[in-house]
Amino acid sequence: MPTPTRPARASDLDRLVAIEELAFQTDRISRRSFRAFMERKTAMLHVIEQEGEVAGYFLVLFRRNSALARLYSIAVHPGCSGHGLGTQLLQAAEQAAFEGGRFVLRLEVREDNPGAIALYRKHGYREWGRYLDYYEDHTDALRFEKVLRGDAEVESNVPYFPQSQEFTCGPACLMMALAHFQPNYRWDAVEEIRIWRESTTIFMLSGPGGCGPLGLALAAQRRGLHVKVLLSHEGPLFLDSVRSPAKREVMELAQTDFRQRIETSDIPVEYRSLDLNDLRETLARGGLALVLISAFQMLGVKVPHWVLVIGDTGTHFVIHDPFVDYEVSETPADCSSLPISHSLFLGMAQFGKQGLRACLLVHEEPLP
């Protein structure tokens, strides 16, 4: 039976320092730093005991307003090895990060530490980068990460479809919803670009534009879905980063066209912010939600990004993120059925200086 961990306390300092000195040759955590981590609100330092004595620890760091947590350090006293304590500590660290609202745990490990690397790979971590000359002795660090899903397996019958272009997250989300509600729906890259052409804002930064909520709503209705739009701002969207007057004018004209077509349709638009109940009630009635987020907390870049909300565990929303970063060996399994805590997701679901919130609530049947 797994041994539970507990928060470290001041009386553990001698043992923690001893473990550190025995487990690592360089880059050791000092007594002073251990004490500081115990008091830091954005850190979780837990120990595991064997026969009444501290046998190991993990240290997880949380970054505010981020979906990521970092396993800063993990160690087992050499005299206590061989009892599976490393695995228990790793699993406890993952659970702590997940319960802290994070759904990705990252770590660094020395490239010359095959035992630790094997442990991480065994438990589903994937290598996604390298830090050169990272440690005090100039050894490189390998970077690993794992998507956290908590204790319960999240099952979904909503198909997953990765976007094929950088600017087609919105169409990919809509196609997933269409494939869920319409089993005979044919989805492919041609349809993806067709939806993008119908709903694009024309420009975004220096490249092709992403898709706006009104254009996507019209595309959804055209394909037989019933949709309701929640939008926190009236008027043109996504203009904060557009410096060219010519581009701004074209974007404003395109969005004026969307608004005029929405006004002559029967698509309801409510100009207010999305809230928790909007999503939970939609999901409870069998609907899905396309939600605009800032990609910064997930992808590290400040761009608008559409995701599809497909489920609710009671504490977490479950999403399909259409972006798969193949350059770092991601697969669709890494990006589908992601559980994100309610509070973290609502924090992510806004973009830009004005805090734009946009959401499409989509259903197979007419809305009540």
Where are these regions (language model features)?
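Noncatalytic regulatory segments and standalone regulatory/sensor domains
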Residues: 284, 288, 294-296, 300-306, ...
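Short glycine/serine/proline-enriched coil/turn segments at secondary-structure junctions
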Residues: 65-66, 134-136, 298-301
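Active-site-adjacent structural segments surrounding the nucleophilic cysteine of cysteine proteases
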Residues: 148-248, 256, 272-273, 315, ...
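Acetyl-CoA-dependent GNAT
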Residues: 7-79, 90-92, 96, 100, ...
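Conserved catalytic-core motifs of GNAT/GCN5-like acyltransferases
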Residues: 108-109, 121, 126-143
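Active-site-adjacent substructure of cysteine-protease-like catalytic cores
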Residues: 239, 244, 248-321
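Conserved glycine-rich acetyl-CoA-binding loop
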Residues: 53, 73-91, 98-100, 104, ...
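Short hydrophobic/aromatic beta-strand or adjacent loop that forms the aromatic wall/cage
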Residues: 43, 139-143, 356-357
